[in-house]
């Protein structure tokens, strides 16, 4: 297991370099950051040249990337155009988004798996058909429509929750945004669990467990569910990074100053250091989540062994 982890970590290095370089090129290809810094006013040529030199923008792109990677390994993600260190922005944005993501993941895991098990065990019945139809609707409706609708109903019309999240962003305030963020993923988890349960319920090991007289709950939890969760774990593992990076719409609706908010502001103002820095961390989150998912396979299925 230890050698497998080391091998996977080494394999992450070229993936990390390739993905961050691609992001770096795409972000800096959007336009001149110095021109975006001055807005509609044309900068003085001498001032523009000085700023480009300070930001290392007067060098070829590959040299800029090497300079940026050197900064990262020193724990320096650069400085935003407003003079604030990107690391300082991360220290305020990531904790909020992590809490929001945690709420969303808990909701999609608990509710999604429970609904998937119920649907899979009752395949072809009214409950199964109803859940499939409901999840299809959830997947089809855009997140911003669901977000504004739930915000209006629960926050404005009924007054059950705050319409927007305060700067403290407590778990209680993040409950409704977490539901909005988790809804589409919850629908996919429900469908994945349902399909996996429906396929494995006919397996020989399930029939053997039932023939031995084991309680129905034990057969479902210890045998059927454990073997059916591998595709679900794969989806959830990759979905964690997607939720963190894809929270832009949800954070905009509920005025949450997290990663999505900072990315939106960075893209809007062509603030390249902010965008590249935040996306770099999201790449690391994706890679680590995939590694954890692979390790969980061996826990869920004893037949899987890593040399």
Language-model regions, residue ranges each:
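Alpha-helical transmembrane segments of integral membrane proteins
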Residues: 2-3, 92-127, 143, 167-307
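Short amphipathic alpha-helical coupling elements at transmembrane boundaries
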Residues: 3, 7, 39, 50-53, ...
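N-terminal signal-anchor/signal peptide hydrophobic helix marking the start
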Residues: 6-15
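Small-residue-rich alpha-helical segments with characteristic i,i+4
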Residues: 15, 122-137, 141-143
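Hydrophobic alpha-helical transmembrane segments of membrane transport/permease proteins
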Residues: 15-66, 154, 158-174
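Membrane-water interface segments at the C-terminal ends of transmembrane alpha-helices
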Residues: 21-29, 66, 70, 133-162, ...
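Membrane-interfacial helix-loop-helix junctions in multi-pass membrane proteins
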Residues: 52-62, 76-87, 163-170, 189, ...
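An internal, D/E-rich "acidic patch" concept
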Residues: 58-113
């Amino acid at each position: 297991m230890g050698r497998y982890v080391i091998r996977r970590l080494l394999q992450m290095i070229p993936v990390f370099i390739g993905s961050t370089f691609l992001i770096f090129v795409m972000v800096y290809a959007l336009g001149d950051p110095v021109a975006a810094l001055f807005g509609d006013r044309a900068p003085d040529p001498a001032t523009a040249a000085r700023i480009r030199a300070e930001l290392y923008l007067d060098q070829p792109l590959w040299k800029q990337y090497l300079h940026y990677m050197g900064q990262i390994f020193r724990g320096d993600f650069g400085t935003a155009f407003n003079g604030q260190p990107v690391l300082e922005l991360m220290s305020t944005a990531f904790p909020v988004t992590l809490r929001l993501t945690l709420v969303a993941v808990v909701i999609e895991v608990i509710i999604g798996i429970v609904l998937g098990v119920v649907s899979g065990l009752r395949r072809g019945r009214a409950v199964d058909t109803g859940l499939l139809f409901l999840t299809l609707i959830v997947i089809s409706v855009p997140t911003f429509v669901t977000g504004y609708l739930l915000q209006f109903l629960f926050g404005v019309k009924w007054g059950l929750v705050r319409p927007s999240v305060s700067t403290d962003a407590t778990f209680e305030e993040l409950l409704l945004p977490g539901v909005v963020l988790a809804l589409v993923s919850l629908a996919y988890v429900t469908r994945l669990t349902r399909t996996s349960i429906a396929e494995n319920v006919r397996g020989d090991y399930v029939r053997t467990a039932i023939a031995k007289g084991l309680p129905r709950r034990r057969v479902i939890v210890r045998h059927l569910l454990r073997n059916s969760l591998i595709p679900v774990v794969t989806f959830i593992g990759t979905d964690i990074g997607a939720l963190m990076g894809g929270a832009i719409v949800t954070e905009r609706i509920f005025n949450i100053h997290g990663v999505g908010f900072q990315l939106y502001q960075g893209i809007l103002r062509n603030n390249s250091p902010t965008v590249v820095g935040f996306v770099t961390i999201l790449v690391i989150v994706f890679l680590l989540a995939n590694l954890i998912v692979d390790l969980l396979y061996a826990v869920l299925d004893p037949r899987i062994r890593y040399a």
